[in-house]
């Protein structure tokens, strides 16, 4: 890092690292403000901009979780991954009714450093659309997914609803399931009791596609 950080900036950077390690995703401005006792998210935004100017993080405009640690970017994967890397199938478009990891969906294998993720993922899913923009998940990103049929309230999940596979935030209200986007331009999805719904996995991290070029 080229420029020395202030004590407060270092606290924020440590909080971002801890949140990414625990959840796989960076905190929002409001979460930073609450954790560090700021009076408003605007104060957190000012510190984040200072961290970006000093080269510690990269900010994505318009996304509440659009924070990326500059020192956590994975290196380009070689043809043969090193022993320290994890080879993960990269899943592109998923055909209706077929398993996510069916051979025809796997575009290639990508070598990644497992320490980048909160848990070891089982595959990478290419993100399509901008419904999770405010969680910092953008079109073309690679979402690291751990296969699971269970998830906690508030976790970002990969779910199959009918013939579609979608990435959303899980919200349960008793027996009712709602799939929440992170973009006000998209509407929540209420899962009806007779819908064909299956939880395919939980998100444990994210790779920006430019890191693989």
Curated annotation (Swiss-Prot):
<dbReference type="InterPro" id="IPR006199">
    <property type="entry name" value="LexA_DNA-bd_dom"/>
</dbReference>
<dbReference type="Pfam" id="PF00717">
    <property type="entry name" value="Peptidase_S24"/>
</dbReference>
<protein>
    <recommendedName>
        <fullName>LexA repressor</fullName>
        <ecNumber>3.4.21.88</ecNumber>
    </recommendedName>
</protein>
<dbReference type="GO" id="GO:0006281">
    <property type="term" value="P:DNA repair"/>
</dbReference>
<keyword id="KW-0378">Hydrolase</keyword>
<comment type="subunit">
    <text>Homodimer.</text>
</comment>
<dbReference type="GO" id="GO:0004252">
    <property type="term" value="F:serine-type endopeptidase activity"/>
</dbReference>
<dbReference type="InterPro" id="IPR015927">
    <property type="entry name" value="Peptidase_S24_S26A/B/C"/>
</dbReference>
<feature type="active site" description="For autocatalytic cleavage activity">
    <location>
        <position position="168"/>
    </location>
</feature>
<keyword id="KW-0227">DNA damage</keyword>
<keyword id="KW-0804">Transcription</keyword>
<dbReference type="InterPro" id="IPR050077">
    <property type="entry name" value="LexA_repressor"/>
</dbReference>
<keyword id="KW-0805">Transcription regulation</keyword>
<keyword id="KW-0234">DNA repair</keyword>
<feature type="DNA-binding region" description="H-T-H motif">
    <location>
        <begin position="29"/>
        <end position="49"/>
    </location>
</feature>
<keyword id="KW-0068">Autocatalytic cleavage</keyword>
<dbReference type="InterPro" id="IPR036388">
    <property type="entry name" value="WH-like_DNA-bd_sf"/>
</dbReference>
<feature type="site" description="Cleavage; by autolysis">
    <location>
        <begin position="96"/>
        <end position="97"/>
    </location>
</feature>
<dbReference type="InterPro" id="IPR006197">
    <property type="entry name" value="Peptidase_S24_LexA"/>
</dbReference>
<comment type="function">
    <text>Represses a number of genes involved in the response to DNA damage (SOS response), including recA and lexA. In the presence of single-stranded DNA, RecA interacts with LexA causing an autocatalytic cleavage which disrupts the DNA-binding part of LexA, leading to derepression of the SOS regulon and eventually DNA repair.</text>
</comment>
<dbReference type="InterPro" id="IPR036286">
    <property type="entry name" value="LexA/Signal_pep-like_sf"/>
</dbReference>
<dbReference type="GO" id="GO:0003677">
    <property type="term" value="F:DNA binding"/>
</dbReference>
<keyword id="KW-0238">DNA-binding</keyword>
<keyword id="KW-0235">DNA replication</keyword>
<keyword id="KW-0678">Repressor</keyword>
<dbReference type="Pfam" id="PF01726">
    <property type="entry name" value="LexA_DNA_bind"/>
</dbReference>
<dbReference type="GO" id="GO:0045892">
    <property type="term" value="P:negative regulation of DNA-templated transcription"/>
</dbReference>
<dbReference type="InterPro" id="IPR039418">
    <property type="entry name" value="LexA-like"/>
</dbReference>
<dbReference type="InterPro" id="IPR036390">
    <property type="entry name" value="WH_DNA-bd_sf"/>
</dbReference>
<dbReference type="InterPro" id="IPR006200">
    <property type="entry name" value="LexA"/>
</dbReference>
<feature type="active site" description="For autocatalytic cleavage activity">
    <location>
        <position position="131"/>
    </location>
</feature>
<dbReference type="GO" id="GO:0006260">
    <property type="term" value="P:DNA replication"/>
</dbReference>
<dbReference type="GO" id="GO:0009432">
    <property type="term" value="P:SOS response"/>
</dbReference>
<keyword id="KW-0742">SOS response</keyword>
<comment type="similarity">
    <text>Belongs to the peptidase S24 family.</text>
</comment>
<dbReference type="GO" id="GO:0006508">
    <property type="term" value="P:proteolysis"/>
</dbReference>
């Amino acid at each position: 890092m080229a420029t020395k950080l202030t004590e407060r900036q270092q606290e924020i950077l440590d909080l971002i690292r801890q949140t990414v390690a625990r959840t796989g995703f960076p905190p929002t401005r409001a979460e930073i403000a609450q954790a560090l006792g700021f009076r408003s998210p605007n104060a957190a935004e000012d510190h984040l901009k200072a961290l970006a100017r000093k080269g510690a993080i990269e900010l994505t405009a318009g996304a509440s979780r659009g924070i990326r640690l500059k020192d956590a970017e994975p290196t380009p994967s070689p043809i043969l991954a090193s022993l320290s890397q994890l080879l993960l199938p990269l899943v592109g478009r998923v055909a209706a009714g077929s398993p996510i990891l069916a051979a025809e969906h796997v575009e290639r294998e990508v070598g990644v450093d497992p320490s980048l993720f909160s848990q070891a993922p089982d595959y990478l899913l290419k993100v399509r659309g901008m419904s999770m923009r405010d969680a910092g998940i953008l079109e073309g990103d690679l979402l690291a997914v751990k296969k699971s049929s269970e998830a906690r309230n508030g976790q970002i999940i990969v779910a199959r609803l009918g013939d579609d596979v979608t990435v959303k935030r899980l919200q349960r209200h008793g027996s009712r399931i709602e799939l929440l986007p992170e973009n006000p331009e998209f509407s929540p999805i209420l899962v009806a009791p007779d819908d064909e719904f299956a939880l395919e996995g939980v998100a444990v991290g994210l790779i920006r596609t430019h890191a693989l070029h």
